[in-house]
Amino acid sequence: MNNNFNGGNNTGNNFTGNTLSNGICTKKNMKGTLSRTAIFSDGISDDLICCLDPIYNNNDNNNDAICDELGLTPIDNNTICSTDFTPINVMRTDPFRKKSTQELTREWTEWKENSPSLFTPAIVGVVTSFLLQSLKKQATSFLLKTLTDLLFPNNSSLTMEEILRATEQYVQERLDTDTANRVSQELVGLKNNLTTFNDQVEDFLQNRVGISPLAIIDSINTMQQLFVNRLPQFQVSGYQVLLLPLFAQAATLHLTFLRDVIINADEWNIPTAQLNTYTRYFKEYIAEYSNYALSTYDDGFRTRFYPRNTLEDMLQFKTFMTLNALDLVSIWSLLKYVNLYVSTSANLYNIGDNKVNEGAYPISYGPFFNSYIQTKSNYVLSGVSGIGARFTYSTVLGRYLHDDLKNIITTYVGGTQGPNIGVQLSTTELDELKKQQQATRDSLVDFQFFTLNCMLPNPITAPYFATSLYESRYSSIGGYLRKDVFKSEDSTCGLGNPGAWTSYPDYYITNISATVQINGENTDTTPLYFKENRPITSTRGVNKVIAVYNRKANIAGTNQNGTMIHQAPPDGTGFTVSPLHPSANTITSYIKENYGNSGDSLHLKGQGYLHYMLSGNGQDRYRLVLRLSGAANQIKLQSPTTSIYAFDTSTNNEGITDNGSKFKDFAFSTPFVIPEQKEIVLYFEGVGSLDLMNLIFLPADDTPLY
């Protein structure tokens, strides 16, 4: 019997083990490998690698050709290929490296050229990545000018219209002619007004000696009114979901405009009264736009998928809307901070497209699913294993093969395992499975077991960053073959030969999970408590493998139990830590889904401790800010000992409601230094119902804008 199922370093006809795919490029003087699209640039230095599909391979210098062909105009005098360019995703060794706008544009453009089946245009990723970098103090203080150049390149509104066209393709809906014409005209008007305002600011800054600030104040007031008048044109009744990505970009332009006014108040000679007014506007519009976007997404999701639908459709909608709108919403409430590295993100997903026994899930299944794919999210992913069977059947029309993956188990650094998903079969049960197949199918002529056994050589520095998950029809007469393959910088491993890869710039795979086949026996769908290892069972086994992607990159190492240690930026920049990434906890906790929060929150009850392990340079001083929703009698920070006393955010909050969470940021008063290893210990007392949404470590001397 020929065994085509290899879990080690060999390659069989159908199942690939730890073997690198052909076509990956490396430079002899550099470490590691690059993406399939990597090419060498002939006309530049011998040490240069350019990871962009060539337009003219034989040109001595193809930068101009690439720029012209792809419509990439250098924004900050950087070329497409640069000696310090790091290929997308392959290494997680320099999380704090600043990228130029041109580099971000090139990365997301390459991603778009190679991304299967997603309608998302590259510009939405560029804008989000740029904004995340711009939250740091060393970034430009005039964000609006750069965002205008990104969203309206060459003084054209075509890029913004591309966002609308892409959303129309995804949701399979189009604006009526009158609304489409009105939106197009509004985009042109917005572009013209932004150009005029940016020019007026430039003129003022160049000729301000002896000139009254009234001119710039008039320009600011005019621009503010134009934003207020134009934003409703992207909130047309009946088309709210379709217009949401476009609204998110327009709202981001307005909020960065307000932020620029506040940050540059001294340089622009803005009076105190005017500054106070615009600070109030800033806070009010962050809340107004956030609530609109979050409620529009929630209503759209429920309308689209109620009462039940496939998880594939649900996760694709979540991923699309996260990339196109919700990532920006997550940033809006953090714009008040002037020096911050956002370390995590909402999850993106790649889910296998196999259709055998797929079934539909009620919309209420979501909290259960969201809990079991993240219940071990504070650990560092190290691999995945599983077992399955391949059946060979014979019919009068010929033979066909059929794969049946029975279970998978995810493993993490330190030996921790995630929930067993599917069905764990004993030898006796496997024999019984064979008998069942013989009794219920076409003539069974062959039967083999196979194992999935993928382990990362370097899970921290070279995690999985791409997946190829699909199921191919074996022949017209029947059968399906599984293809579930995972790619890191060091290895490619999985079942079958990979097809198109799914990855996202600056995202890494933080968990591998699966759905189970529907058969009426999946009775316990209550959400898992955090860290619970409850099996996710089905006698029919695994249906779709799922890869979970996140921006989490600043991992200094792991604790003895395998949980992650969070690296503070070396230059004293503030940073965030996800509440889902503790090193230990003794308080009853569950995962609470949030839409606009750079990830989900930890829902706490009762009293107990949460521990987080950090690593810093031993010099920079920080204050800890907790983003909280709910009520508690006291939260105590140990070392230094300081407390947040009784609070209730139901009446005292930021004015934003995120899937039921009404939050406020609370700061501990005592600053502290983060040495090479520092444990943050939080004690929660008298908690009735509390969402811990974010931990924000601010530079001790920094003050929020409001």
Swiss-Prot record:
It comes from the Bacteria. Belongs to the delta endotoxin family. This is Parasporal crystal protein Cry18Aa. One of its GO terms (molecular function) is signaling receptor binding. One of its GO terms (biological process) is sporulation resulting in formation of a cellular spore. Keywords: Sporulation, Toxin, Virulence. The keyword Nucleotide-binding does not apply. Disulfide bonds: none annotated. Binds to the brush border membrane vesicles of scarab larvae and somehow damages the gut wall to allow the vegetative cells of P.popilliae to enter the hemolymph. Active on M.melolontha. The keyword Cell membrane does not apply. InterPro entries: Galactose-bd-like_sf (IPR008979), Pest_crys (IPR038979), Pest_crys_dom-III (IPR005638), Pest_crys_dom_I (IPR005639), Pest_crys_N_sf (IPR036716), Pest_cryst_cen_dom_Cry2A/18 (IPR015214), Pest_cryst_cen_dom_sf (IPR036399). The lineage of its organism: Bacteria, Bacillati, Bacillota, Bacilli, Bacillales. PANTHER family: ENDOTOXIN_N DOMAIN-CONTAINING PROTEIN-RELATED, PESTICIDAL CRYSTAL PROTEIN N-TERMINAL DOMAIN-CONTAINING PROTEIN.
